[in-house]
Amino acid sequence: MRMRPSPRKAVFVLIDGARADVLRELVDRGDLPNLARWVLEPGGGLRIGTTVFPSTTGVAYIPFLFGRFPGNVGIPGIRWLDRAEAAGGWRAQWRAMRSYCGVQAGWINRDIAPGPSLFDLVPESIAICTPITRGLRPGAHRIPLQRAFFGAAAHYFGSYGALDRAVAQAWVATAAESWRLLFVVFPGVDGVTHLRDPKHPAVVARYRAVDDALGAFIARVRQHGELPAFFVAADHGATTMREHRDVAVELEALGVRTARHPMHVWRRGARVAAMVSGNASVQLYFEPRSGRTTPRTESEIPAAFLEPLLDYSALRLAAYRADQANESGQPEVIVRTQQGRARLSESPGLIRYEPLDGDPLGLGGYLELEDRELLLRSRDTDVPDAPRQLLQLFATPRAGDVVLAAVPGADFRGPWEIPEHKAGHGSLIREHMEVPIAASVPLPNDPIRTVDVMPAMLEYLGVPLPACDLDGMPFSKLVSRSTVPGAPCRSTNPRARWISARCRTPASQWIAGAASSRSSCPPSICQPVRVTMARNRPRASASFP
């Protein structure tokens, strides 16, 4: 009798806050031998993808677990305002000032719009250390108490090693169990980055801890059968913060009463509510106690508030809804900087970028392109995928009236925060939006979004994609344009993430972005070159030049 083959298995490892350049550096130095051997080599190397805006923990998990952009499922940030409840009594006001950073953290599971999660689609799933648990079977959410206890202690005392060790032990313990999908989150890189900087030796130690855990899991799981497929990614990047420009505090100094977390949730007579995400982005809601439930559009936004914000040295851009919507009723978006103003809109199959004054997104002028083409074009700017991300954010009426994104090195929350965030994320800038994506299965050469990982895992597992629309695409449908006759060769474009046998862009430039010009070599040779990773190099010093 012929035996049926065992169903495929997959493991997703989320290294919260991992920067692609740091990961690349550590791989090149031989500091992550297990990742190199078991993931990067069989999958063809590391890709750099783009995450979502706001680029912050929890919100940026949604693409991996739902295949959707956060705005399309009603989650505009890690903090946001429920306009309807904000005009109620003190209990309603507390509920309205939504924050997934404290006791309301679990509410994200009910706030996400109805739709199947990865755990619904793959019932034989186990998750470790994730705040989003919707769809998990009873008992499939591991170490919830340890996550709560060690997570709180780590936030105030920096003891992320204990939390990562708990994750590693729980992960290794699953090797002998029956499952089809493991979803494993390591919070340490992000947590220590906030306390130090993205390249601090203590942060590097957290990357190594993840690699050690991967090696321990592989050693254990090989005793029980074949290896699963591995998918590894981060949810956002990070930058060191040199300037804290606390919008809420500055508005208060101007006499504008501002509701904000954590101590001014019930601010009496509040004219503005400031809801920070990742610290490098903030959403402003005007007249939060008015009872108005609909967002404001351009003509309704007080210029007396907006214009001074545009002069902030910390501001990369501001965005808000245009007065008009598209034919589907979705809002068009106005993008502002001190020097420029542009309109973003979407029609079936196309996104339109229309500069009205200057070029605030740095795209070179008017564009009307298919979504993935615009993604590719935007990768050469300092705000990759900004058009799509701003449109998806304002797709939910829960988003603020005005959204601000910071420049590198700046955020919108003061040093009073306990502990002070010496590094952070949340903005639309490249350093926050670009993330590493790797897999032990072949990856496409076209630009990848984190929202593509969920359908790719389903495709690998042989699970049908849900009937509802997904914002991501399985890897098999991301056909490289380098194979299309007459397509331009992009082998030395650092955002295209491939290298050519003839053009010979070094891997370090391919990943870190040292090269900047497009090659003129013919498309026929624009094929990916496999990068061989060192397996047994000695560990280098845990410091960066």
Could you tell me what each predicted segment is?
Residues 45-65, 129-135, 471, 475:
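Short, solvent-exposed turn/loop segments enriched in Gly/Ser/Thr/Pro and often Arg
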Residues 383, 388-419, 426-466, 475:
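C-terminal substrate/ligand-recognition segments
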Residues 60-201, 206-209, 336-380, 399, ...:
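His/Asp/Glu-rich, glycine-adjacent segments
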Residues 255-256, 261-293, 366, 422-460, ...:
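Substrate-binding rim/cap in mid-to-C-terminal beta-strand-loop elements of soluble/periplasmic
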Residues 480-482, 489-510, 514-526, 530-545:
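Low-acidity, Ser/Thr- and Arg-rich intrinsically disordered low-complexity segments
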Residues 1-45:
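Active-site-proximal N-terminal segment of extracellular/periplasmic enzymes that hydrolyze or transfer
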Residues 12-14, 181-185, 231, 403, ...:
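Structural motif
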Residues 24, 30, 42-59, 78-107, ...:
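Secreted, luminal/periplasmic, and some membrane-associated catalytic domains
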